[in-house]
Amino acid sequence: MLKYASIALALATLGVAQQQQWGQCGGIGWTGATTCVAGSVCSVLNPYYSQCIPGAATVTSSSAPSTPTPPAGALPRLGGVNTAGYDFSVATDGSFTGTGVSPPVSQFSHFSSQGANLYRIPFAWQLMTPTLGGTISQSFLSRYDQTVQAALNSGPNVFVIIDLHNYARWNGGIIAQGGPTDAQFQSIWTQLAQKYGSNQRVIFGIMNEPHDIPSISTWVNSVQGAVNAIRAAGATNYLLLPGSSWSSAQAFPTEAGPLLVKVTDPLGGTSKLIFDVHKYLDSDNSGTHPDCTTDNVQVLQTLVQFLQANGNRQAILSETGGGNTSSCESLLANELAYVKSAYPTLAGFSVWAAGAFDTTYVLTVTPNADGSDQPLWVDAVKPNLP
């Protein structure tokens, strides 16, 4: 497992430039300002990142700050893994051929025994409703629900994200922009809300990785319609609101975020409307390479600033990951340490991926046949579970 050296920040002399609230003020390799403007405290969040957090005076800290009090109704700190399989063969244009593969249910108890408390279970729209806008397939729902229940039963505090994994599309057409109508999109969520609305540990992942959306404002209206439909069905679950550009955490503050923060909850308040973001660590942010080139801390810092400035909202990093390589073991550990330290603004993470992926998959965290874990899980994920 990775070992971190402790960081001690020295008091800077007067006259040195000061960092603004929420700006970086220290960390391994940091060469900028190490004092904060009046009213902020330079606090160590992890060995690579210290931040100017509003406080009583400008001081430095050699240990992480106490965890902020979560707002009423906030999600608890979460950490876990995507258990893929029912999404296999969904293309990025929303087309699908296949039957899906059931994730091994033994993985849930395996990971939960180590502290995981979040499982994201993706599925193809076409498997759940073979006819667009039609009724849910009871045979598939029974199969899918067995997986959901196995995850929930693996621990009393485990949450499950049911993830519609279709890229805001059905067979090439974008929702409300030449493809499925808003009513057809709402139909599947109405039915899923009727199924899972009684269990508050089921989080509704409204859509995986919308991308190349001609009108983001139209897409946000579609998201609002899904929220309204879920609430009209009587469900009070937490909802994950997806942005654009493949749910990019980097694009969120300037692209979809300013519109998504205006989505309202018929229940009142915003504590159950959580933003859904993704960020990989390879050279092109695609999650297709075994090596990592960034820990995304600066990207996530900007996201945190945006969320705190817009109503102290929460987000989940529901996809991130890397290969079982030394670069990813180090950089993913840094990223997840920051996510954990940024609670409650960042509610948690789920790494990609286990489930029906075999151990040769480039981003696998699927346990080996002998029950041992992948190096990435041992060195980067497990130390940062809740």
From Swiss-Prot:
Subcellular location(s) per record: Secreted
GO biological process, one term: cellulose catabolic process
Protein name: Manganese dependent endoglucanase Eg5A
Domain of life from the UniProt record: Eukaryota
Active site, renumbered: 209, 319
Gene field: Eg5A
Keywords in alphabetical order: Carbohydrate metabolism, Cellulose degradation, Glycoprotein, Glycosidase, Hydrolase, Polysaccharide degradation, Secreted, Signal
Native species: Phanerodontia chrysosporium (White-rot fungus)
Temperature dependence, free-text field: Optimum temperature is 50-60 degrees Celsius.
